[in-house]
Amino acid sequence: MAAQPVSRVVRRVLRAGVRSCSSGAPVTQPCPGEPVVEVLSRPRPFLGEHAAPFSAFLTDSFGRHHSYLRISLTERCNLRCQYCMPEEGVPLTPKADLLTTEEILTLARLFVKEGVDKIRLTGGEPLIRPDVVDIVAQLRQLEGLRTIGITTNGINLARLLPQLQKAGLSAINISLDTLVPAKFEFIVRRKGFHKVMEGIHKAIELGYSPVKVNCVVMRGLNEDELLDFVALTEGLPLDVRFIEYMPFDGNKWNFKKMVSYKEMLDTLRQQWPELEKLPEEESSTAKAFKIPGFRGQVSFITSMSEHFCGTCNRLRITADGNLKVCLFGNSEVSLRDHLRAGASEEELLRVIGAAVGRKKRQHAGMFNISQMKNRPMILIELFLMRQDSPPALPSTFRNSLRVQVLRHRVSFSSQMVTLWKGGGVPQAPLVAQRWLGSSLPQRHFSSHLDSDANPKCLSPTEPQAPAASSGPLPDSDQLTHVDTEGRMAMVDVGRKPDTERVAVASAVVLLGPVAFKLIQENQLKKGDALAVAQLAGIQAAKLTSQLIPLCHHVALSHVQVQLELDRTRHAAVIQASCRARGPTGVEMEALTSAAVAALALYDMCKAVSRDIVLAEIKLVSKTGGQRGDFHRT
């Protein structure tokens, strides 16, 4: 380890000669031209009494040595994932407030001198930063730094990896949440699945082993692909890392969307009973498993169900220069401001030491974390890449994919391995080819309506109203819109508590081959049928109380209407979701939205065919309210 810039004796004097107290709040900002220097916030006698082999400034009050630093190079990204950013978008930091290359290297140099031996570059998407290769090359010159890693979405990886390897990059994590090209495009709102697979292929070709693939598992989106991801490790030196879905500001975390480590493990063991656990490395965040005879392995990142705080050795620096000692904490210290105020190396170390000293024993747990205010993930780093819950896939879309995955799992795995061994760029998985033919869907629409009628409904810190009863009420055998004399009556919701209400409904329009082809190619004389239907669905949701006589008026905070073309049935699958905070549910708004979108699609196509059938108008799910949640199976 490199020599320490400040001796242990000097550090003891500094700690003993200054009194301090701490409330646990973030470090205050320095006055212009005058850096604020903080001392360690609590005594740590074991550091003063023993000759510590590791920097006192990077050792917290629980004895954890922080030897791993993650640096975000940018807040920007070349994908537009539905669950990486809040719906209202992310205001990017002005360029002048971001760390410069020299500031990044200055901080990295300081941390390495104190004992950090591993640095991982993150984002945003780090590979869109123009000087990323130069940064890696200069980091490689730091004495004592053993590992330089990068976490990327893989879009630019194949092109840049040869240069990065030459510069000194030693580890790669690639974020990929699905093996189905159509679903990939649905998730990230961009094409690029084959570029990601090409990047994985290039990493293997250049000798990186294992190549780590990060997959955030979310119920209703990709939990049905667990076995496909594991099958890839049979012939490829991959470490597929399944990550429990975690809450961040703006992603409306829902516990029901989290698939726990034990549930995932049970799923894998049903297919591979011989799955064996591997020894865990010290400070590892992953629980590793291997199937005998497979080249690669599988890991689980269990931040929510079984945290690993006791061995945490990680610190994070955001793109705007703030130090985060815990990924889930909202306390940050601006190292950038101290740097620009002219703080000396010793002063910077004391600021860092104060922040590390305040690090808690463990994070708050999954239920409390979901209520905490924190940065959106895109503004921290891309480690787990995309933590939000996207709109649920239409049930017919999801079920079609699941059937194909199960039917062709072995073929898909062997096809991928054959392609890798052959050195070619992997093509679309068999599952996608069977569902879509040889190409991706030509058209996909997704729209959002955000209303400021009730802005509080999206706040993760908004206190929940007390429930009217200790549990959900059973379904009633009485009609609530009929009074005791059998006459219609509007339900009085004035005494019901306000709660977050979400409902999803779907409809299917069986178009027939002629109308389907015209819509697919956007050749209808009336114009863009999907866009018109989409807009009609949004309008209908807002007007539901005027169409359904006894329906209450609801101040909707969000409406989303999606249309997918299903070529196997020559059909359009419509999904409408509505959200509001109030005393009554929004299932009627969702159902009306889906139904009117289907009617509008019929109207656009009726000149071509009157044999069109509107089918399967149904409620898919609802959450919130005294009667509990409903999810159609």
Curated annotation (Swiss-Prot):
Molecular-function annotations in GO: 4 iron, 4 sulfur cluster binding; cyclic pyranopterin monophosphate synthase activity; GTP 3',8'-cyclase activity; GTP binding; metal ion binding
InterPro entries: Aldolase_TIM, Elp3/MiaA/NifB-like_rSAM, MoaA, MoaA_NifB_PqqE_Fe-S-bd_CS, MoaA_twitch, MoaC, MoaC_bact/euk, MoaC_sf
Pfam families: Fer4_12, MoaC, Mob_synth_C, Radical_SAM
Reaction(s) the record says it catalyses: GTP + AH2 + S-adenosyl-L-methionine = (8S)-3',8-cyclo-7,8-dihydroguanosine 5'-triphosphate + 5'-deoxyadenosine + L-methionine + A + H(+); (8S)-3',8-cyclo-7,8-dihydroguanosine 5'-triphosphate = cyclic pyranopterin phosphate + diphosphate
Modified residues (Phosphoserine): 61
Residue positions where N6-acetyllysine is found in the record: 195, 525
Region span, Disordered: 446-480
GO BP term (any one): Mo-molybdopterin cofactor biosynthetic process
Pathway listed: Cofactor biosynthesis; molybdopterin biosynthesis
Ranges for region Molybdenum cofactor biosynthesis protein A: 1-380
Cofactor details (free text): Binds 2 [4Fe-4S] clusters. Binds 1 [4Fe-4S] cluster coordinated with 3 cysteines and an exchangeable S-adenosyl-L-methionine and 1 [4Fe-4S] cluster coordinated with 3 cysteines and the GTP-derived substrate.
Radical SAM core domain: residues covered: 61-295
HAMAP family per record: MoaA_B (MF_01225_B), MoaC_B (MF_01224_B)
Protein known as: Molybdenum cofactor biosynthesis protein 1
The organism of origin for this protein: Bos taurus (Bovine)
